[in-house]
Structures are given as C-alpha cells and as structure tokens.
Amino acid sequence: MSQQQQFKYIVRLFGQDVDGTMKVPYALAMVKGIGYNTARAIVFKLGLDKDRRLGELSDEDIKKIENYLTDKKILEVPNWMYNRRKDYESGIDMHLVTSDLIFYVRNDIEREKKIKSWRGVRHSLGLKVRGQRTRTTGRTGVTVGVRRSKAAQAAQQQQKAQASSGGEKKQG
C-alpha cells in the first residue's frame, strides 16, 4: 500500500475521534485529561517522532499510546505530571482520561457536598470555590436596571417642559 492509502484523517483514540492531520502531541492534547506537556512526555517515552501526523501512525503505535496510559506505565514520568495524585480511596497516583476523569471529579464534588466541607458548600450553592471574589464577577440571573423614583421622573419632565417653553419664547 502507498502512503496516501494508509493515512487516516480521523483516528479513534481513547474512545474519541481525533483529527489525523494534526501532529502527534497536539492531537493527543485534544483528548480530555491529556495536556500538551503530558502528550510530549508520552511521545518522548514511546520514542515516536513528534513531527509526524497522527494519521501517519500505524495501528500498533496507536495501541501503544493507549496502553501507555491504561496500563499505568505512565509511572515513568514524574508524579507532578499526573492529573490525580494520591487518590482519596486507593492512595495511589493515577492519570485519568476521558470519561474516567469526569466520573472521578464528579464523585469528588459529591463527596465534598455530602461531608459539607467548605468547598462542598460552595459547590452546592453554585458559588466560586477557589477563593475568587464574588462581589461583582460571577453573577448569574437576570440583570436589574436602575429605576427612577416618581419624584425624579416628575422633576425631569418639568425640566423638559421648561426647556421647550423657554425655547419658543426666544423664537417669538
């Protein structure tokens, strides 16, 4: 087969469709849970060319990438690169991708709500959690405009009436 026939424009990676025309690190970064730095580390550890397109990789290379994360072989990188260090239940360092990451984060938030920690209370109230200011930013709901009092409206109408009547006298 020639190179043109082997090129895949859409590659299935971690149960997600990824653009095959992108370079390998950038294409890996499109998967939820894998950032650019993690993608570069994976490419380096597996000995892949970072300048190749994802669609040019063989099926074995793609399986190698998937197995690298699922078989916990990512342990070869420093622990600060994991996206889930010292798991609450097991105590081990993990790197989660796609639906696993979403599931664990959702469970963490529900656990914090259940034990009524500060973060859990903030989550349950729909407020900011990480110490940001909330006086002016992060407002939700319908904006309420400023309404004038009836006295202010009457005074404004009176001024308009005086201005219009005063203008007519000058002309006449």
From Swiss-Prot:
Q: Which residues cross the membrane?
A: none
MF terms from GO for this chain are:
rRNA binding; structural constituent of ribosome
Q: Which domain of life is it from?
A: Archaea
What Gene3D superfamilies would the database entry show?
A: 1.10.8.50, 30s ribosomal protein s13, domain 2 (4.10.910.10)
Q: Which GO terms describe its cellular component?
A: cytosol; small ribosomal subunit
The UniProt entry, under InterPro entries, shows: Rbsml_uS13_C (IPR027437), Ribosomal_uS13 (IPR001892), Ribosomal_uS13-like_H2TH (IPR010979), Ribosomal_uS13_archaeal (IPR019977), Ribosomal_uS13_CS (IPR018269)
Single biological process term from Gene Ontology: translation
Give the Low complexity compositional bias ranges.
Answer: 134-163
Which Pfam families did the record assign? Ribosomal_S13 (PF00416)
Disordered as annotated region, ranges: 131-172
Keywords from UniProt, A to Z, are: Ribonucleoprotein, Ribosomal protein, RNA-binding, rRNA-binding
What job does the chain carry out? Located at the top of the head of the 30S subunit, it contacts several helices of the 16S rRNA. In the 70S ribosome it contacts the 23S rRNA (bridge B1a) and protein L5 of the 50S subunit (bridge B1b), connecting the 2 subunits; these bridges are implicated in subunit movement.
Family note: Belongs to the universal ribosomal protein uS13 family.
How does it associate, per the subunit comment?
Answer: Part of the 30S ribosomal subunit. Forms a loose heterodimer with protein S19. Forms two bridges to the 50S subunit in the 70S ribosome.
Query: HAMAP family of this UniProt entry?
Result: Ribosomal_uS13
The protein's name is Small ribosomal subunit protein uS13
Give the originating organism: Sulfurisphaera tokodaii (strain DSM 16993 / JCM 10545 / NBRC 100140 / 7)
